[in-house]
Regions:
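Helix N-cap/capping motif at the beta->alpha junctions
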Residues: 8, 30-39, 60-62
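Two-component/phosphorelay signaling modules centered on CheY-like receiver
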Residues: 10-29
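Alpha4 helix (beta4-alpha4-beta5 surface) of REC/receiver domains from two-component response regulators
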Residues: 17, 62, 85-102, 113
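Short amphipathic alpha-helix used as the core "switch/output" element in two-component signaling
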Residues: 39, 61-74
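Active-site beta3 strand of CheY-like receiver
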Residues: 44-52
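Receiver (REC) domain active-site loop signature in two-component systems and cognate sites
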Residues: 55
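C-terminal output helix
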Residues: 106-115
Length: 123
């Protein structure tokens, strides 16, 4: 399975990418900003996108909207991740187009369960 991980923090990117790849089930593509992430989503067609919702862009929800508007990427599930753990953040993420939401700091086992659940859903 192919995962696209969009994360602006190099340490977080390396750590989570490495842990996911060690599971043996995943090929992990990395993007350091939302523009690169959206382009990779179109060209690589990952099975799921892990998207940092705290990217340094004017509108942090724009990458989600962009991916869900594009016919080539609209059906790729997005797991939004944010340091804001309030219910309102989850609700906003889901309303904007995320299929799942995970609060940071990431609990790896919980995220892995979420990724596998999303990948198991019929398309």
């Amino acid at each position: 399975m192919k995962i696209l991980y969009v994360e602006h923090d190099d340490d977080n990117l390396y750590m989570l990418k490495t842990r996911l790849e060690r599971c043996g089930d995943f090929e992990v593509l990395a993007a350091e900003d939302s523009e690169q992430g959206c382009k990779l989503a179109v060209t690589e067609r990952p099975d799921v996108i892990l998207l940092d919702l705290e990217m340094p862009v004017e509108d942090r929800w724009e990458p989600v909207r962009t991916l869900k508007k594009d016919l080539r990427t609209r059906n790729i599930p997005i797991i939004g991740m944010s340091v804001y753990a309030e219910a309102s953040e989850r609700e906003k993420a889901m309303a904007t187009g995320c299929d799942e939401f995970d609060a940071k700091p990431i609990e790896f086992d919980n995220l892995l369960t979420t990724v596998r659940r999303v990948l198991a859903k019929p398309k």
